[in-house]
UniProtKB/Swiss-Prot annotation:
Pfam families per record: Squash
UniProt-recorded name of the protein: Trypsin inhibitor 3
Domain notes: The presence of a 'disulfide through disulfide knot' structurally defines this protein as a knottin.
Lineage: Eukaryota, Viridiplantae, Streptophyta, Embryophyta, Tracheophyta
Disulfide topology: C3-C20, C10-C22, C16-C28
Keywords noted in UniProt: Disulfide bond, Knottin, Protease inhibitor, Secreted, Serine protease inhibitor
Main subcellular location: secreted
Compartmental location: Secreted
InterPro entries on file: Prot_inh_squash, Proteinase_amylase_inhib_sf
Organism listed in the record: Cyclanthera pedata
Similarity annotation: Belongs to the protease inhibitor I7 (squash-type serine protease inhibitor) family.
A GO cellular component annotation in the UniProt record: extracellular region
Length: 29
């Protein structure tokens, strides 16, 4: 999957860019 390496806070996968997923840490990865 393609995930830009940008630190983004999230609550759900839809908060993240491209194919990033929302990790348990509360950040996209």
């Amino acid at each position: 999957r393609i995930c830009p390496r940008i630190l983004m806070e999230c609550k759900a996968d839809s908060d993240c860019l491209a194919q990033c997923i929302c990790e348990e840490s509360g950040f996209c990865g």
